[in-house]
């Protein structure tokens, strides 16, 4: 079997799908994208495609090394996202050829189900509480929400009070009936993170995500030493070599590699195994589409240290398409009691509605994240 063609489709809300075709008619699907940089990743996919045409898709490990080491310059979000989507599609092909789900090819299940959590949007406490109530009606009891607005290096205590007030009202409304993580989104400096985390401790969040940017990872162990709240990060780390440094430094309780950003299934399975050796949990980052989610689930179901799985159903970014709009086998993604079950169909287990993908990709607008500024006019972290 030989690879014959790679086709990319930019889609709403901010996704990109990749179709890899073979000379025997077997097709694999992947989801290579950086939110807001889809065209750049698309160019990288087609550059890497030059290595792949005419090659055997079954040699996933070799093709991964060719894509990663074939160029003198490597790593980073663009290249690793391109590799990630290609890697997903190659695993999809392998599973279809062997008539087995990817988790089966990687050694089989370590669990029967995996807890899912849902994003909750809203800028005011009442909006967040209303969102949680709606999501509880469809079975969720675990959530993630933005922990705060953008903060300067040293900022107003009123912003800290506002963030704490939101969390306090959520805990008062729901008590211990729900769990929630708080995403600082890299918006907070180390000095402000120390203050904010301390103020949030009485409300027992499940975790604090990206308390500072990955570029400031040296603060993770320092912040962790000052709190009992688990610290999570990893969505902006792109290879096992970056994760190696934070694991060795300590401080993180949960790693959050993104299966569409960090080299795909092949790389993230290695990252998961590294994390297990350090007694660190795994919670793959996934605010993206169904192919990315399927890839995450296969890694979750082979990784003993997987703790829960993010998914984008109802997320505020999903303007123009919902999580399963391009999927035929929607029932396979149905959650029971807030848990995902293993995907049982061959490959990734996602049946893509190709006709709709082609139609919706025509004239798809480019998504860009907002550009925020502080009160003084300087650029803020979004």
Swiss-Prot record:
InterPro entries (UniProt xref): DgoD-like, Enolase-like_C_sf, Enolase-like_N, Enolase_C-like, Galactonate_deHydtase, Mandel_Rmase/mucon_lact_enz_CS, Mandelate_racemase_C, Mandelate_racemase_N_dom
Gene Ontology MF: a single term: galactonate dehydratase activity
Site (described: Transition state stabilizer): 310
Cofactor binding: number and manner: Binds 1 Mg(2+) ion per subunit.
Active site (UniProt): 185 (proton donor), 285 (proton acceptor)
Positions of Mg(2+) binding: 183, 209, 235
Pathway(s) per entry: Carbohydrate acid metabolism; D-galactonate degradation; D-glyceraldehyde 3-phosphate and pyruvate from D-galactonate: step 1/3
GO biological process entries: amino acid catabolic process; D-galactonate catabolic process
SUPFAM superfamilies assigned to the protein according to its UniProt record, in alphabetical order: Enolase C-terminal domain-like, Enolase N-terminal domain-like
EC number: 4.2.1.6
Catalytic activity as recorded in UniProt: D-galactonate = 2-dehydro-3-deoxy-D-galactonate + H2O
Domain of life from the UniProt record: Bacteria
A Pfam entry, by short name: MR_MLE_C
Regions crossing the membrane: none
Positions of the record's site feature: Increases basicity of active site His: 258
Metal-binding keyword on record: yes
Cofactor: Mg(2+)
Keywords associated with the record: Lyase, Magnesium, Metal-binding
Matches recorded under NCBIfam families: PRK14017.1 (NF010624)
Physiological role: Catalyzes the dehydration of D-galactonate to 2-keto-3-deoxy-D-galactonate.
Family as reported in the entry's similarity comment: Belongs to the mandelate racemase/muconate lactonizing enzyme family. GalD subfamily.
Additional observations: Reaction proceeds via an anti dehydration.
Protein name per its UniProtKB record: D-galactonate dehydratase
Organism: Cronobacter sakazakii (strain ATCC BAA-894) (Enterobacter sakazakii)
Organism taxonomic ancestry: Bacteria, Pseudomonadati, Pseudomonadota, Gammaproteobacteria, Enterobacterales
The encoding gene: dgoD
């Amino acid at each position: 079997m030989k690879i014959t063609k790679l086709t990319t489709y930019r889609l709403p809300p901010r996704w990109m799908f990749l179709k890899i075709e073979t000379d025997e008619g077997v097709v694999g699907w992947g989801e290579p994208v950086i939110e807001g940089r889809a065209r750049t990743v698309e160019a990288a996919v087609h550059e890497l495609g030059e290595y792949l045409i005419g090659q055997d898709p079954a040699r996933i490990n070799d093709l991964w090394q060719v894509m990663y080491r074939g160029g003198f310059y490597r790593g980073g979000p663009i290249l690793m996202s391109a590799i990630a989507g290609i890697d997903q599609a190659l695993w999809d092909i392998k599973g279809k050829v062997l008539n087995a789900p990817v988790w089966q090819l990687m050694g089989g299940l370590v669990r029967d189900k995996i807890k899912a959590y849902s994003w909750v949007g809203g800028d005011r406490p009442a909006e967040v509480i209303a969102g949680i109530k709606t999501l509880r009606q469809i079975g969720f009891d675990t959530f993630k929400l933005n922990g705060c607005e953008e903060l300067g290096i040293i900022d107003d205590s009123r912003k800290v009070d506002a963030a704490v007030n939101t969390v306090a009202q959520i805990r008062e409304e729901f008590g211990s009936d729900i769990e929630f993580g708080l995403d600082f989104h890299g918006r907070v400096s180390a000095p402000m993170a120390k203050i904010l985390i301390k103020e949030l401790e009485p409300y027992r969040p499940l975790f604090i995500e990206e308390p500072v940017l990955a570029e400031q990872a040296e603060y993770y162990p320092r912040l962790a030493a000052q709190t009992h709240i688990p610290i999570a990060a990893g969505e902006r780390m792109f290879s096992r070599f970056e994760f190696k440094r934070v694991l060795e430094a300590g401080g993180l309780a949960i790693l959050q590699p993104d299966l569409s950003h960090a080299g795909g299934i092949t790389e993230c399975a290695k990252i998961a195994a590294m994390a297990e050796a350090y007694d660190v949990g795994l919670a793959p980052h996934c605010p993206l589409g169904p192919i990315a989610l399927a890839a995450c689930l296969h890694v979750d179901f082979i990784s003993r240290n997987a703790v829960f799985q993010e998914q984008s159903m109802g997320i505020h970014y999903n303007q123009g398409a919902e999580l399963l709009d391009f999927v035929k086998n929607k029932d396979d993604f149905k959650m029971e009691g807030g848990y995902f079950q293993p995907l049982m169909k061959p490959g990734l287990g996602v049946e893509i509605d190709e006709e709709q993908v082609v139609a919706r990709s025509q004239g798809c607008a480019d998504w860009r994240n907002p550009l925020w500024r502080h009160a003084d006019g300087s650029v803020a972290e979004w």
